[in-house]
Amino acid sequence: MGNANIDESDLKILEILKKNARTPYTLIAKELKVSEAAIRKRIEKLIRQGIIKRFTIEYELENEIRAIVMVQSTPQIPTPEISKKIAKIPGVEVVYETTGDYDILVIVRGTNITSINRTIDEIRSIQGVVGTNSTIILRTWF
C-alpha cells in the first residue's frame, strides 16, 4: 500500500467519506476548495492504491444484537488462516487481527442471543481457536 503519496487533502477526503461514503464529490470539492474533477481523480487514486478498499454502510436494526468476540489462537496455526475462516461465518460482520491477550477481535451480529451464541460456537469450533471472551454491544456512537 503506497501511503507515501497521501497528503492532507487525501486525509480530509477519507475523513469525509468515512462519515458518509455517499457524500457527493461536488460537496467534497466545495469543502476542500478544489474542482469536482480533482476530487474524482484523488478518490480514483486512493482506490487504485488500495487505500480505499470499499464503500459500505454502517447500520443498526431495532432488536438486533451485536457483540465483540475476542479470540485467542494457538501459535501452531497462523492467525491469518484462522481469521479468514472466521470471516466466512454467517453473522460475522468484521474481523480484526490484534495484539495483546487476544489475537483476533470479531464483531458479530444477530437477531437474538441464540444466534449470537451460535456464531460464537462456530468460531470456537475452528481449529486453532483456544479461547474466546465475548461482550454485548449496548450502543454505537459515530
Swiss-Prot record:
Q: Name one GO biological process term.
A: lysine biosynthetic process via aminoadipic acid
Involved pathway(s): Amino-acid biosynthesis; L-lysine biosynthesis via AAA pathway [regulation]
Per UniProt, the keywords (alphabetical) are: Activator, Cytoplasm, DNA-binding, Transcription, Transcription regulation
Q: Where is this gene product found?
A: Cytoplasm
Example GO CC term: the record gives: cytoplasm
| Inducing stimuli | Constitutively expressed.
Residues covered by the HTH asnC-type domain:
6-69
State the PANTHER family in the record: HTH-TYPE TRANSCRIPTIONAL REGULATOR LYSM (PTHR43413:SF4), TRANSCRIPTIONAL REGULATOR, ASNC FAMILY (PTHR43413)
What protein am I looking at?
A: HTH-type transcriptional regulator LysM
